[in-house]
């Protein structure tokens, strides 16, 4: 049997393969050269954002600013609604890439609608958070950091999620570039016995404080109220009427 050696034209030694791509790369634990997730980040619409979610005696209140930016430097839109209904008793607020957010919302809403069609009832908020987490973890990479809020038979729920698929429940939370400023206000002013009206004032104060210091947040606020009766979202360009 012919045994190729280094001098044979049939030999496949390492020297001859130096310029040939390795079909087995990248290996587990290695990354492609460069951070491709950041490619073109300066031209991608982002909701730099301050978003907050609070549980109340009456349900859940979610709030977000209205600004979208390009690369965190240029304001590309001053009237973005960052809270979207997923089902009549649940909503999702988004910080991060606008395109990723829109795609993720469509996917989660489709799954919720499919569940309702099959079961004849809305998905529980805990199950909805698990579905959202699974989509983030197992689907395409979404550069988004959402807050999920909703009301079911067990009361009001607020969940923080991240692009890696984690899901954490809390009585209040904040996300986005303005999170440090908003959380400071929530830590001082939140209490578990808040009414919806009280929570509206606290959330407005949190978003306003973030908007004053975070260049990627501002241009007004959307307030979303979720109760057993349904979901409503109202936009305000000024904070004075809410404080």
From Swiss-Prot:
Localization per record: Cytoplasm
GO BP: proteasome-mediated ubiquitin-dependent protein catabolic process
PROSITE patterns on file: PROTEASOME_BETA_2
Gene3D superfamilies in the record: Glutamine Phosphoribosylpyrophosphate, subunit 1, domain 1
The EC number(s) this enzyme carries: 3.4.25.1
Inhibition and activation profile: The formation of the proteasomal ATPase PAN-20S proteasome complex, via the docking of the C-termini of PAN into the intersubunit pockets in the alpha-rings, triggers opening of the gate for substrate entry. Interconversion between the open-gate and close-gate conformations leads to a dynamic regulation of the 20S proteasome proteolysis activity.
The organism's place on the tree of life at top rank: Archaea
UniProt entry keywords in alphabetical sequence: Autocatalytic cleavage, Cytoplasm, Hydrolase, Protease, Proteasome, Threonine protease, Zymogen
InterPro entries per UniProt: Ntn_hydrolases_N (IPR029055), Pept_T1A_Psome_bsu_arc (IPR019983), Pept_T1A_subB (IPR000243), Proteasome_sua/b (IPR001353), Proteasome_suB-type (IPR023333)
Region annotation (Disordered) ranges: 1-46
Assigned GO CC terms: cytosol; proteasome core complex, beta-subunit complex
GO molecular function, one term: endopeptidase activity
Family statement: Belongs to the peptidase T1B family.
Function comment: Component of the proteasome core, a large protease complex with broad specificity involved in protein degradation.
Subunit description: The 20S proteasome core is composed of 14 alpha and 14 beta subunits that assemble into four stacked heptameric rings, resulting in a barrel-shaped structure. The two inner rings, each composed of seven catalytic beta subunits, are sandwiched by two outer rings, each composed of seven alpha subunits. The catalytic chamber with the active sites is on the inside of the barrel. Has a gated structure, the ends of the cylinder being occluded by the N-termini of the alpha-subunits. Is capped at one or both ends by the proteasome regulatory ATPase, PAN.
Protein name (record): Proteasome subunit beta
Lineage: Archaea, Methanobacteriati, Methanobacteriota, Stenosarchaea group, Halobacteria
């Amino acid at each position: 049997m012919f045994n190729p050696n280094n001098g044979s034209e049939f030999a496949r030694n390492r020297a001859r393969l130096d310029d040939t791509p390795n079909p087995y790369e990248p290996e587990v634990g290695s990354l492609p050269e460069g951070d491709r997730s950041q490619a073109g980040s300066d031209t991608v619409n982002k909701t730099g954002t301050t978003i907050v979610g609070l549980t109340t005696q009456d349900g859940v209140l979610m709030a977000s600013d209205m600004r979208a930016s390009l690369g965190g430097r240029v304001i590309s839109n001053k009237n973005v609604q960052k809270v979207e209904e997923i089902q009549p008793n649940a909503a999702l607020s988004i910080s991060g890439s606008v395109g990723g957010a829109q795609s993720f919302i469509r996917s989660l809403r489709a799954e919720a609608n499919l569940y309702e069609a099959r079961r004849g009832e809305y998905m529980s908020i805990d199950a909805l958070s698990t579905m959202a987490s699974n989509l983030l973890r197992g689907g395409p990479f979404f550069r988004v950091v959402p807050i999920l809020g909703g009301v079911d038979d067990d009361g009001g729920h607020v969940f923080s999620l991240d692009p890696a698929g984690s899901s954490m429940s809390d009585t209040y939370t904040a996300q986005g570039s303005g999170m440090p400023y908003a959380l400071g206000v929530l830590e001082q002013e939140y209490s578990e016995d808040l009414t919806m009206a009280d929570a509206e004032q606290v959330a407005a104060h949190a978003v306003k404080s973030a908007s004053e210091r975070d260049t990627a947040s501002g241009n007004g606020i959307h307030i979303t109220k979720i109760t057993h009766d349904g979901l409503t979202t109202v936009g305000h360009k000024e904070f004075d009427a809410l404080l």
